Amino acid sequence: MAEYLPCVEVEAGGPITSAVIWLHGLGADGHDFEPVVPALGLRDLGVRFILPHAPRRPVTVNMGLIMRAWFDLRGLDFQGDVDEKGIRESVAQVEALVARERGRGIASGKIALAGFSQGGSIALSVALRHPEPLAGVVALSTYLPAGPWAEGRATAVFQAHGTEDPLIRLERGEETRDRLQALGCDLTWKTYEMGHSVCPEEIADIGAWLRASLGTPAPA
């Protein structure tokens, strides 16, 4: 039997007909975005939210401190020296979660990925290389790392970034936006007056985008 990442699961409505796999940022865990789920306004839909915990690993930029991380960060310019091994491992682990949802009867076109910061990097990397088209990706305050995962299948993307982000600067988000558009992605780009975080307006926009992307009309 396959071993999966430990996950928090929250079901909104029923029967379950779609799934969102949501990846947290560096140093957080699957509970980080759990309070966001009810705020998305999708209670009427049959959506299963899967919020996995990243493995623990040493993180170079944090003096080797062991924390939950999807891959090692060796610098804060988010360019150049990329932890390809860590990215490949996390991509494979998330792909396994997608396959599990397929095994639960969810069509690939009803599975969306979401991620914040380096969680968004993995979500984008999985969706662009996945053999079946997914419903789309919610990429928050993130960037697409250099490597083979920066090429592949065009997909629907909701990308959002804080204009005052001190960690992953807006320019890096804009570079990723341009790369995704060059790949032919159906991209929705939003900016918000905030730092490296999320805000209520953004959460409302994510909820509306997920509702449309999962193919379920809003209630009257």
Locate each region found by the language model:
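Alpha/beta-hydrolase fold active-site loops
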Residues: 18, 155-156
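Residue-level signal for short, function-critical loop segments
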Residues: 25, 117, 143, 163, ...
